[in-house]
Amino acid sequence: MSVEDVVRINLDFLDHPERSGIFNVGSGRAETYNAVAAAVINAVRAAGGRPPASVEELVREGAISYIPFPPALVGRYQNYTKADLARLRAAGYGAPTLTLDEGVRRYVEWMMARERG
């Protein structure tokens, strides 16, 4: 989930004090670590004028590699997370959130702009 979306949702609640409660905030879409890694790598590639690559291509290129799952985490790790936005939507917040690729792209561009000064 993009920080932009979190801020947008919080500002919406400030504008609507009649809404109260505890709400899940997220995109409502489950994303894999592969998708997150590919989004980051492809955003950096795009900034350098290179075309996006699939996860499979990124693995072949060595941009994504895997390590064995730590035995200490077996049975203790939540490998699937997807925010249930039903209460948030029922409270009146209906704006869409950025896609994973768009949110990561904006963040990478922001970070690179800061590096350039």
Placement of each model-derived feature along the sequence:
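C-terminal substrate-binding subdomain of Rossmann-fold SDR/epimerase-dehydratase oxidoreductases
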Residues: M1-G117
